[in-house]
Regions:
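Carbohydrate-binding surface patches
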Residues: 223
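Active-site neighborhood of glycoside hydrolase catalytic domains
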Residues: 16, 21-186, 194-201, 205-211
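Anionic-ligand-binding alpha/beta catalytic cores of soluble enzymes and soluble regulatory domains
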Residues: 214
Length: 223
């Protein structure tokens, strides 16, 4: 903040690792088909049952405290594991729809408690991107692939439902980490202009002329 910047922090609030104190203390806070069986893990994770009021309050209170104490301006809400075999142990009923509504409510409650807070629904492959989330989020993340050639199609079809200014579109390094395709900075920057531009690129490794060119593009985007 002292340098005129805003502070963002990356969260993955719906996920819990079975090898964690939270899971060991509250195994009933996880969506699962039966009492004795968990869904298949994804990235060593299971899904917290936000339809359970106690679990909801725990997640909300933890995030609310961090936003207030750290002065967080921007939240990236990640969501990597697919919500499968999602039954709430509390009710014994399918919970995908209610889980989604609970996520909307956390977004709404956090933004009401912290005016000016922005939240990105950052989920690779669109796991937390739908028309409902557009009412409560400030930005969505279309894909972890930032190769501008691939992004042309991603942006094209995502923008059929999502306004371009809400679609995160980043300038990455060349070659791209996801496709290993080498592209010019001009192409990468031009593609980023079709969405909500950002940068995910280790500029400490780049020559000054690349950084200067990037600064010119950024200044143009801000006009």
């Amino acid at each position: 903040h002292g340098k005129g910047l805003e502070f963002g922090l990356w969260f993955e609030p719906e996920m819990v690792n079975p090898d964690s104190d939270l899971f060991r203390t509250h195994p009933d806070w996880v969506l699962k088909p039966t009492e004795g069986r968990l869904p298949m893990q994804g990235r060593t994770q299971q899904v917290v049952d936000l339809t359970n009021p106690d679990a909801y309050d725990y997640i909300y209170d933890a995030m609310d405290k961090l936003v207030g104490e750290l002065g967080i301006d921007y939240i990236k809400w990640d969501h990597n594991k697919l919500v499968t075999e999602a039954v709430s142990p509390r009710t014994g009923r399918p919970a995908v729809h209610q889980q989604t509504l609970a996520v909307y409510r956390i977004f709404t409650d956090l933004k009401a408690a912290h005016p000016g807070l922005e939240i990105e629904s950052c989920s690779s492959g669109g796991g937390r991107v739908d028309l409902g989330i557009l009412e409560v989020a400030d930005r969505i993340w279309g894909s972890d692939c930032v190769d501008p050639v691939e992004r042309a199609d991603i942006q094209r079809y995502t923008s059929l439902l999502v306004p371009p200014e809400m679609i995160g579109e980043h300038v990455g390094a060349s070659p791209a980490h996801s496709t290993h395709r080498a592209t010019t900075q001009e192409l990468r920057m031009a593609m980023a202009f079709f969405g909500h531009m950002g940068i995910e690129w280790n500029l400490l490794k780049e020559p000054q002329e690349e950084i200067d060119a990037l600064a010119e593009w950024v200044a143009e985007f801000k006009k």
